[in-house]
Amino acid sequence: MKPAGAFLLLISLACLFLSVDAVSQGGFQAFCSNYEKTLAPDGKSCPKTHKPVCGTDGKTYQNRCAFCQTAMERSLGKLGFKHEGKC
């Protein structure tokens, strides 16, 4: 492989890992984009499905919808998605 090709491959992989890390370490915006338009103001629109997710605050949320509802209430990036499953 030519040095230029190897360099481009290395840069591409670095960008991929950085973007994955950015979503897992913080920003709920991309993670919650599907829920922004569906959440009702009364907060009762989340299903009771048990598929836990862990927030960067160390709390386990019942599902993505419950996490996103809390994240949008707090806004300003104070709560991020850490990983699927219990904390």
Curated annotation (Swiss-Prot):
Its chief place of residence is: secreted
Q: Which GO terms describe its molecular function?
A: serine-type endopeptidase inhibitor activity
Disulphide bridges, residue numbers: 32-68, 46-65, 54-87
**Keyword Signal in annotation:** yes
Cite the record's tissue specificity text. Expressed in epydiymis, in the caput.
Cross-referenced PROSITE patterns: KAZAL_1, KAZAL_2
- CDD domains given for it? KAZAL_PSTI (cd01327)
Q: Which Pfam families match?
A: Kazal_1
Record domain Kazal-like: where = 26-87
Which residues does the UniProt site feature Reactive bond point to?
Answer: 48-49
Question: What job does this protein perform?
Answer: Inhibits trypsin.
Write the protein's name: Serine protease inhibitor Kazal-type 12
Q: Species name for this entry?
A: Mus musculus (Mouse)
